[in-house]
Amino acid sequence: MSEGRTDGDTWGPAQSVGATATMVAAARAVASQGPDALLDDPLAEPLVRAVGLDPFIRIVEGKLDFPDDPLFNRRARAEQITVRTRFFDDFFIDATEAGLRQAVILASGLDTRAYRLTWPAGTVVYEIDQPQVIAFKTDTLANLGAAPTAERRTISIDLRDDWPAALREGGFDVTRPTAWSAEGLLPYLPPEAQDRLFDNITALSAPGSRLATEHVPDPNAFSDERLARISERWQRLGLNLNAADLFYRGERNVVADYLTGKGWRVTPHPARQLYARNGFEFPEDEMRATFGEMSYVDATLTGGRG
């Protein structure tokens, strides 16, 4: 376990893991700007401004850029977040077109899909995250006059706690196929909690349920050296964050293999292929190459509950 993480630690959108959610929202805001915008997320920028972290505000205002950095220059960051966002957007769109009317966004952070996607009538979208993060986003978007485009139900709980019970108490229907997303989440969970997350998802899923997540197969992706390099880049942005304090390390099960063993039919989508599909050139920076073998994963539950 990272020395900076403790059992039961909590955060809002300006601290610890929560600040990384704001970082992602800032990237979506940048990708949504200008006549050649890659994304359409009009709520990302106001959420970032409401959090109030100066480096992220400067990023969305175009006042902080590192054109010499192949990972953190505005264009590279916009393309990276576009690949990721479009993958999960398309996942939910495809799931609802297949008839699924129940969705769960795990570690929802500042995700705005419950507000910006066109959900079919009768769709219920559950968002699960830390209480402070849920409250902040709900209040901020209400003050902006934004309204969900589906029935949005929030579950304020840490994913290391008994979130399945909280989800059921919130009205989740275990008899209905569900579209699940675990976006940008797994490194923030201990290895055993990652397995438990997928066990719980499987136990809660009716046949035909779908799941989207990511996997980095390189066991050295979060080595001390690489985490130090990530931290250096964050500090260059003016962020007082240490990657080694946020990520849990240790040997993990391969996501695709683990889900297959639980009865899911898994389809991996290598990041390089998704870059090409979106018309982008994959960055050849060493840090980006580390994640070049990363796969976005979608899966469908073929049998009964595990």
UniProtKB/Swiss-Prot annotation:
One GO biological process term: methylation
Enzyme Commission number, as recorded: 2.1.1.-
Entry's Gene Ontology molecular function annotations: methyltransferase activity
Pfam entry (one): LCM
InterPro entries to which the protein is assigned, alphabetical: Ppm1/Ppm2/Tcmp, SAM-dependent_MTases_sf, SAM_mthyl_Trfase_ML2640-like
Annotated family: Belongs to the UPF0677 family.
Positions contributing to S-adenosyl-L-methionine binding: D129, D158, L159
Keywords for the protein's UniProt record, in alphabetical order: Methyltransferase, S-adenosyl-L-methionine, Transferase
Function field: Exhibits S-adenosyl-L-methionine-dependent methyltransferase activity.
Protein name as catalogued: Putative S-adenosyl-L-methionine-dependent methyltransferase MAP_4190c
Superkingdom: Bacteria
